[in-house]
Amino acid sequence: MSTLSSIASIGIGATIGASCRYYIGIISVQYLGKGLPYGTLISNIIGSFIAGVLIVLVLEKLFLSETYRLMLLVGLAGSLTTMSALSIESVEMLSGGHYSQALINIVLNLALSLLAASLGVLSTKYLFNLA
C-alpha cells in the first residue's frame, strides 16, 4: 500500500469519526444537558468499543485489509475518541472550581472506555469463536 493510499484511508476514516463525534456532542447536549461533557464520554465509549472489535479482527488476521484497518482503527476510532477534549474539558472544570465534576468526568471516561474496549474484544472473540 502506498503512502498516499494510507493517508487517504486514514483521512476518510478520520473525517467520518470526527463528524460523528461532532454530532454526538450536539445531540447529547439536546438530550442530556450540559451537566457533564456527555458527547465526549459517549464518543469515547463508542470509539473504544469499535477499537476493541477491530483489534481482534486485526490480531486474528480475519477479514480486514490494510486499507480498512487504517481507515477504521486509525482514522475512524482514532478521531471518534478524544483524549484532548477530555483533558481540556476537565481542566476547564478544575479551573472553575468544579473539582468533583472533573473527577467524575475523568473516572467515567477512563472506566467506561476501558470497559467498552474490553466488551468489544470479548464479544468479537465470542462471535468468531476465538475465546
Question: What would you call each of these model-derived segments?
Answer:
Residues 1-131:
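Membrane-interface helix-loop junctions in multi-pass transporters/channels
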